[in-house]
Amino acid sequence: MNAVISGDIVSSTALNELELELLRKNVLQLIDTFTGDPSAQTGDIPFYGHLIKGDYIECYLKEPKDSLRVALIIKTLVKMMVLEKSPDNALEKKRLLFKKYGVRLAIGIGSMRTVDTEQGILDGEAIYLSGRKIDDQRSSNKEKVVIKNTLFFETTENKLKEQGSVLVDLLDVLLTNATARQCEVLHYKLLGFTESDIAQKLEVNQAAVNQHSTAVGWNSIEHTLKYYEQLEF
């Protein structure tokens, strides 16, 4: 089996052109990093990803065990973006949704019939499951200002679905409550950086990095990832 991660940016229409362009640039840079040198920081992850229409993400992973870590890396990348407060109250409500949730992501686990990276074509059970879940969320939440979940796990294997869904539901709560700075620290920890490396990168002291790491629940997240990676896919 393989994995596909499908995702769409929450309230992307509330971002101005410069913000949206920066977000797209950051996502594409991340995709290029995985694709160009999959062994850098994240380990050997056979990976292909692309951005569609500026706010829809699709990523293929040969190894399903790596899918949750990559999903969290994407999630934290989006959520660590800082937005200025808008004077328009209606617009600010939408921008707050982006700040809180960032991006909806669905992990689909299943077979893949076609993985054509040259043509950008992905087809098969895994992408059908992840894509359908995101499409369902986009339509059901179209007129709502309350979003219940933003991380999903889909597979036709009942036992695996039960195991995976419990894990992503718990992580969803942690990340929804995380601040932009906490997500930034978590993002680099997920990529394999040490707290010392992160402190230098963010130009803060290591104690501050450790404080954010503890507040976001890094130990629990790390244990959850290790458990997920040992599931029988």
Label the predicted regions:
Residues M1-F233:
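Regulatory and interdomain segments flanking nucleotide-handling catalytic cores
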